[in-house]
From Swiss-Prot:
Active site: D333, R335
Annotated positions binding GTP: R256, M257, H258, S259, S260, Q277, E299, G300, R301, T321, T356, K361
Native source species: Porphyromonas gingivalis (strain ATCC BAA-308 / W83)
Biological classification of the source: Bacteria, Pseudomonadati, Bacteroidota, Bacteroidia, Bacteroidales
Descriptive protein name: Riboflavin biosynthesis protein RibBA
HAMAP family with a match to the protein in the record: RibA (MF_00179), RibBA (MF_01283)
Record gene name: ribBA
Residue segments, region GTP cyclohydrolase II: 206-405
Length: 405
């Protein structure tokens, strides 16, 4: 069987600048699909026809959050419950400019061009329509490893307007095209094919999203460590790397990616297992003689201390930890692993033995181009205050908790 060899991001960017299609694939643990993606400002009726004929999916137009705001494109629903939280806005058609029903290849191309044109006003777009804009997250693939963000990132990296067109690639028999079939499609049409994880790695190498502080000695009750603070450039949040020992970049290092928990880490709360996991991680690293804890300022799975306390109040009234978050308008987990991934890279860690019970954390870090060679559980003994919480994490979030029957 022919070896599948993906293109480099540098090769892909050259084609993208010229208005050529790229095939972009995501992680097999996510959607495991490939999309045709092209810069919005390079679209033509013939290219729309190609996408519809050979892609067979849903024709969408990813745009930046800022662009969606400028065009007054509201989200399609206030509470997105789709599997991967695909960020659909209201659908649109270009008004005027020779457009009629909005469904022809010409009309669709005109609508996509209008989304990219900085002169387009909200009143130039009819709602609903035949094009589905997608609102990309700020910070792109460094925030969400999806095709929407990849498309906008590619446009920005090429110096174009932050807008693109994409469509999923479906086999002729109606099944989703996976990597072997996508590889054949790329050869058939002479298109470059790239992976989102490689785009993430490219951006992490090219861009700095955190500012490194001074390194200091940090003796603790659980071992002797070194500590470096990091400041997130986008919002000023400060994070910590607590580590011990030295290593080379190909060595699998013991790592704990730990989100801050003031109640558990500082006060020893029995409502969660956070404090116990942190201490276990420190003890394991001390025993091993090398390793790192990335302490992320993402209280309450990313919702903040005030909102976490509101969630606690709802839990006292009978809700579980997930439903409490959802009731408050949050996702079950809002953490951003891109920050931790860059901190690990700055520490020279590319391979790790990850200390976690959370499969989503593993997937989240692997999406940023890091290799996890082993998963090491950090289990604490349940108590009467946190047993329901731990059971929820096991049954609804897939955590590997053998102490919970």
């Amino acid at each position: 069987m022919e070896e599948i060899k993906l293109n480099t991001i540098e090769e892909a960017l050259e084609d993208f600048k010229e208005g050529k299609f790229l095939i972009v694939v995501d992680d097999e643990d996510r959607e495991n699909e490939g999309d045709f993606i092209i810069a919005a400002e390079k679209i033509t009726p013939d290219k729309v026809n190609f996408m519809m004929h050979h892609g067979r999916g849903v024709l969408c137009a990813p745009i930046s959050e800022e662009r969606a705001h400028e065009l007054e494109l509201e989200m399609q629903v206030p509470d997105n419950t789709s599997v991967h939280e695909t960020p659909f806005t209201v659908t649109v058609d270009r008004l005027g400019n020779g457009c009629t029903t909005g469904v022809s290849m010409y009309d669709r191309a005109q609508t996509i061009l209008a989304l990219a044109d900085p002169n387009t006003r909200p009143s130039d777009l009819g709602r609903p329509g035949h094009i589905c804009p997608l609102r990309a997250r700020s910070r792109g693939v460094l925030r969400r490893a999806g095709h929407t963000e990849a498309a906008v990132d590619l446009a920005r990296l090429c110096g174009m307007q932050p807008a693109a067109a994409l469509i999923e690639i479906i086999n002729e028999d109606g099944t989703m095209a996976r990597l072997p079939q996508l590889w054949e499609v790329s050869k058939r049409f002479g298109l470059k094919i790239i992976a989102i994880k490689d785009l993430i790695a490219y951006r992490l190498k090219q861009e700095s999203i955190v500012e490194k502080g001074v390194e200091v000695d940090m003796p603790t009750e659980y071992g002797h460590f070194r500590l470096i603070p990091f400041r997130q450039k986008s919002n000023g949040l400060e994070h910590i790397a607590l580590f011990k020992g030295t290593w080379d970049e190909n060595e699998p290092i013991l790592v704990r990616m730990h989100s801050s928990c003031a109640t558990g880490d500082i006060f020893g709360s029995m409502r969660c297992d956070c404090g116990g996991q942190l201490l276990q991680a420190m003890e394991k690293i001390e025993k091993e003689g090398k390793g790192a804890i990335i302490y992320l300022n993402q209280e309450g799975r990313g919702i903040g201390l005030m909102e976490k306390m509101k969630a606690y109040k709802l839990q006292e009234q009978g809700m579980d930890t997930i439903d409490a978050n959802l009731c408050l308008g949050h996702k079950a987990d809002e953490r951003d692993y891109g920050i931790g991934a860059q901190i690990l890279r700055l520490l020279g860690i590319k391979k790790m033995r990850l200390m976690t019970n959370n499969p989503v954390k593993r997937i989240g870090l692997e999406a940023f181009g890091l290799e996890i060679v082993e998963n090491i559980p950090l289990e604490t003994a349940p108590n009467r205050y946190n047993e329901f919480y731990l059971r929820t994490k096991k049954e609804r979030m897939g955590h590997e908790l053998h102490n919970i029957k």
